[in-house]
Structures are given as C-alpha cells and as structure tokens.
C-alpha cells in the first residue's frame, strides 16, 4: 500500500472493517489506515426511507442543508433557515435495519473512540483504547491541542447505560433473526483458525447470500475497496458484482464487517463490557477549533497532520450536488479539517469510498 499513512474516522462497522483489512492483509491487500478514530453510534439511516419520511412532512431532500443528532433529537437544518426536529425514538421508519444486529456503541476496536454522551455540553467523551491511542491523546494534551479531565462517575454511568441499551436491544433482534434462518455471522464466536477456514471458502457470491441478500450489509465499501480486479461496485443501495471473481480471491469476505469475526478481534465476552476494553476515559474540549461538541476529532486530526504522524486524514464534507448528503474524502490540508469541523457527527455510509477513489 506504499508508505503513506492515513487516519480514519468512522462508525463502529467501518472501524471493524479497517481492522479486518489490515489484520488479514495477505488476503485483502491491506490499507494505509494507521490510526483508527471511532465514533459513538446507535444506528444510521436509510436515505431512501428518510427521503420518503421527509416528503410526508412536506420537506424535499434538496431543501436540506445538513442533518445532525443533537440532545436526543434528529435535526434537519433547511436551506431557508427553518429547522425540523423529532426525537430519536421516532426515527424508526427510516433507520437502517442492518444496524439492528450491531451491539457496538463505542467503536470497541478503534485506537480512540469519541462521542458526546457522558460529557458536558461543548465537550466530547474520549475513550483511549490502545497504546497508540494513548500516545496521541497524551501528546494532544501536552501540546495544548485539547484539554482533558477524567470523565465524571455520573457521565460514565450514563455512557454505560446507553451502550447497554444498544447491546440488550440488538442482541434480542439478532437472536430472533438467527432463529428464523437469517444468519448473523458476525455474532458467531469462532477462533482465528476457524475464521481462516470459513472465509477461505468464500467469494462475492457467498457475500451476496450471507450478508447482502439478508439485509446485513452496512454499505461501508470495504468489499469494493479490497477487490483486486474492481469486480465489485457500490451504488446507493448495495454492492454488486460486475465480473467474475478471481479463482483464489477471498478478499471481500475477509474484509466485510458482517461476515465472521474471530476471537482475536472480538474476544469472548466483549458484549459484557458495555464500553469494550480501554485504558482511560476523558471529557475533552478543544477551544481552538469551533466544532460540534468541542471540535475534538478535528483537533486530533490537526495534531496528527502537523506532527507528521499521518500523511492524510479522512474528513466529511458536503456533496456539491446534494448538500444534505455527507461525503467522505482524504486530505492532507489543515484548512480542510477545520472547515469540516462542524460536520463532525455527520457519518457517511460508504466509508471506504475515499480510499477507493485514491487507488
């Protein structure tokens, strides 16, 4: 993948795909992702059903400037200055159903996890998970990029409560799916040896049957990214095959976050730890960058670029033809990171598209 290093910001499923791609690089080709910053995520939304829902409320998608999740509300900021909001509990009609088999709220396999739950207004909760993540956060604090203090007991209890709610709800859902013959492979505990054995038998046709056709695809774009012959394409709805796979290629099946996950990545009993495995948890703010919940992700990305820790970072901007649609891209420019700070929690479903476009 060359010598370039990238910092990825993504949802739990995207971070999991990045982890699998690099762990099994002899099968997937690897990636330049060197730092993984995961976002807290309860669920994502289907643009198709969101469009239908908004139309029922008298709003067209082209009238929307941006979407945000704020204080338990789903908020649409319109181009004309008006604001439409509903409680998160009422977003069920346009929630992506594949999100209901995920039990990871805090991006458990990232280096650093970031979200708003558990910290005061204009601050972010930061979970430090790896030694690499600790070195980054310690340096950000020491050099003044961020200010941090240990999360309060009340804040951590709230965070654990929300994470447990996702685990409890979605465990019930995926077990029901398994009971009626709709496989949820990512929740089946298997060893590393079993993982290699199973995935080495599978190609895109198997991915189609085991993940896509049963409604488990999260549109992360990992399969498209790792395909060595560009046989997989993703439109706005699902991955499709446009030509035959190479005979001995199993890259897409190894990379997908909704196929098997070995206990080397997700240790047994991880769901019993609502916040996953971690080293430290902080409440953090970054006064130098104006962004949602303190601009903390942006401050970390600026630190990584200014100190040559990575060459590029992933940020979310606006699709020029559809401002409401978040678009992920890679940049080495500090000004791009600062400009994107206000879109911190706008997550884009096709998370690997920026890397694919760079190939």
Q: How should each PLM-predicted stretch be described?
A:
Residues 1, 146-147, 152-189, 195-197, ...:
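Flanking helices and flexible, charged tails adjoining ferredoxin-like Fe-S electron-transfer domains
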Residues 39-52:
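Short, conserved secondary-structure transition motifs
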Residues 54-201, 310-311:
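Long, compositionally biased charged/polar accessory segments in the mid-to-C-terminal portions
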Residues 23-38:
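A short alpha->loop->secondary-structure connector
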Residues 1, 16-23, 355-359:
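Cofactor-cradling patches in redox/metallo enzymes
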Residues 8-18, 43, 293-296, 320, ...:
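Gly/Ser/Thr-rich loops at beta-strand to alpha-helix junctions
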Residues 3-6, 85-97, 209-215, 239-247:
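Immediate flanking context of iron-sulfur cluster ligation sites
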Residues 107, 112, 199-216, 222-240, ...:
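Iron-sulfur cluster-binding cysteine motifs and their immediate structural context
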């Amino acid at each position: 993948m060359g010598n370039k290093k990238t910092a990825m910001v993504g949802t739990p499923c995207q971070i999991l795909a990045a982890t699998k791609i690099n762990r099994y690089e002899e099968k997937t080709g690897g990636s330049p992702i060197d730092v993984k910053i995961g976002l807290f995520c309860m669920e994502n939304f289907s643009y198709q059903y969101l469009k239908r829902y908004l139309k029922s409320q008298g709003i067209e998608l082209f009238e929307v400037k941006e979407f945000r999740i704020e204080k338990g509300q789903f908020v649409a900021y319109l181009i004309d200055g008006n604001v439409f909001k509903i409680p998160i509990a009422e977003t069920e009609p346009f929630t992506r159903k594949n999100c209901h088999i995920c039990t990871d709220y805090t991006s458990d396999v990232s280096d650093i996890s970031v979200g708003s739950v558990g910290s005061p207004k204009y601050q972010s909760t930061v979970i430090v998970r790896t030694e690499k993540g600790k070195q980054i956060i310690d340096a950000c604090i020491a050099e003044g990029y961020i200010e941090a203090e240990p999360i309060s007991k009340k804040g951590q209890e709230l965070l654990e409560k929300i994470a447990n709610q996702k685990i409890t709800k979605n465990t019930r859902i995926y077990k029901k799916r398994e009971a009626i013959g709709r496989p949820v492979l990512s929740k089946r505990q298997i060893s590393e040896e079993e993982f290699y054995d199973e995935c080495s038998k599978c190609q895109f046709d198997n991915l189609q049957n085991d993940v896509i056709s049963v409604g488990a695809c999260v549109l992360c774009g990992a399969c498209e990214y790792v395909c060595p012959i560009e046989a997989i394409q993703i439109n706005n709805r699902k991955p499709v095959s446009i030509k035959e796979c190479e005979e001995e290629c199993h890259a897409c099946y190894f990379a997908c976050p909704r196929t098997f996950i070995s206990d080397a990545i997700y240790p047994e009993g991880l769901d019993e730890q609502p916040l996953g495995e971690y080293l430290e948890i902080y409440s953090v703010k970054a006064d130098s960058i104006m962004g949602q919940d303190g601009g903390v992700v942006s401050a970390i990305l600026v630190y990584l670029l200014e100190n040559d820790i990575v060459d590029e970072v992933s940020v979310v901007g606006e699709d020029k033809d559809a401002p409401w649609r978040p678009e992920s891209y890679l940049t080495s420019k500090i000004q791009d990171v600062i400009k994107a700070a206000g879109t911190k929690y706008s997550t884009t479903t096709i998370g690997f598209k920026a890397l694919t476009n760079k190939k």
